[in-house]
A protein has these predicted regions:
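Residue-level recognition of beta-strand->loop/alpha-helix junctions
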Residues: 45-47, 205-207, 249-252
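Second-shell loop/turn segments in exported
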Residues: 12-19, 45-49, 178-180, 223-226, ...
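Solvent-exposed, polar/charged alpha-helical surfaces in well-ordered, non-transmembrane soluble domains
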Residues: 27, 31, 61, 187-194, ...
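Serine-dependent acyl-ester chemistry module
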Residues: 79-237, 255-256
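Helix C-cap/helix->beta junction micro-motif
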Residues: 33, 66, 197-199, 243
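Catalytic His-Asp segment of secreted/periplasmic serine-dependent ester chemistry enzymes
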Residues: 210-287
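Hydrophobic anchor at the start of a short beta-strand
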Residues: 41-43, 201, 245
Length: 287
């Protein structure tokens, strides 16, 4: 096997909103023809377009079966709020897998979490669950089309640019200063490192838009007030140092004009900047 396998997990910025497959982070890393440990670097995109650390941990657990040489976990503060962990459909509809992670690795999950979709006996039958089966077969057909065309999303000719002017609002998920580790799903992040085991994992704080518009002295962007994000970065540095994690903070590595319809969605040029920043870390991680 002459492939140095890199699995990239994250949100819609990794998945590639408004990007063609070759323009995504994984696509651009593959185009660079990097060589690590005498092998050709091959990056695999396991991004999924919702933001939740617990969702990412689920994907990490599935990725293990592909025996990656390196895992890159792209994340951002909005993946950490406690109330977001199980609300994403990928988690809400896979309670059994989440409970398995809780049992095996100590992932913190409430016993009575109401976000999980619980099916009754009728809903588990083929007739009662026919909508899900219809979706399943339709997606298999779509998959053939996506593979044949390389197109797996709608590319609008025009789109609304990411917001850069804001109200004078310092709020973030009802949290109050100072931000603490208890406010965030740190347990899910720790679980992710347990799940990958001996496989090296880069923890990357992904680039975000830094606005210079109205009230940008209060908010960096639509997602984050400055106070919250600044404290989050301090927490991430402290956590990584305490646990010996390889942490790469690229929060301000891409200029504001290289974002598209969101404060975390990059243009192809922005993705290229990100790939160039990450390439040296990939080359350092030979088994």
């Amino acid at each position: 096997d002459d492939e140095f396998r890199v699995v990239i997990v994250g949100d819609s910025s990794v998945w590639g909103t408004l990007l063609k497959p070759e323009e995504t982070l994984a696509g651009q890393l593959n185009a660079d023809n990097l060589n690590a440990c005498g092998k050709t670097v091959r990056a695999y995109n396991l991004g999924y377009p919702t933001i939740s650390l617990t969702k990412d941990v689920m994907l990490l657990s599935y990725a293990r079966q592909y025996d990656p040489d390196l895992v890159i976990l792209m994340t951002t503060l909005d993946a950490f709020p406690l109330e977001k962990q199980t609300s994403t459909p990928l988690v809400a509809n896979n309670e059994e897998k989440v409970r398995e992670l809780a049992t095996s690795y100590g992932l913190r999950v409430e016993a009575d979490d109401s976000n999980f979709e619980v099916k009754n006996f009728w809903q588990k039958t083929f007739v009662g669950d026919r909508r899900a089966w219809a979706d399943f077969f339709r997606l298999q057909i779509y998959g053939v089309m996506w593979s044949a065309t390389g197109i797996d999303q709608f590319y609008p000719a025009e789109y609304e640019k990411a917001q850069t002017d804001f109200e004078a609002d310092e709020s973030y998920h009802d949290l109050t200063a100072p931000l603490s580790e208890d406010d965030l799903a740190i347990n899910a992040l720790e679980t992710g490192f347990q799940v990958v085991g001996e496989t090296p994992m880069l923890l990357v704080n992904e680039p975000m838009l830094i606005s210079s518009g109205a009230n940008s002295d209060i908010r960096y962007n639509f997602f984050y007030p400055r106070w919250t994000y600044d404290e989050y970065r301090k927490i991430m540095y402290a956590l990584s140092e305490r646990n010996g994690w390889t942490y790469v903070d690229l929060w301000d590595s891409v200029p504001a004009n290289e974002f598209t319809n969101s404060a975390i969605h990059l243009t192809p040029v922005g993705e290229n900047m990100l790939a160039e920043n990450l390439a040296p870390y990939i080359l350092e991680n030979c088994k």
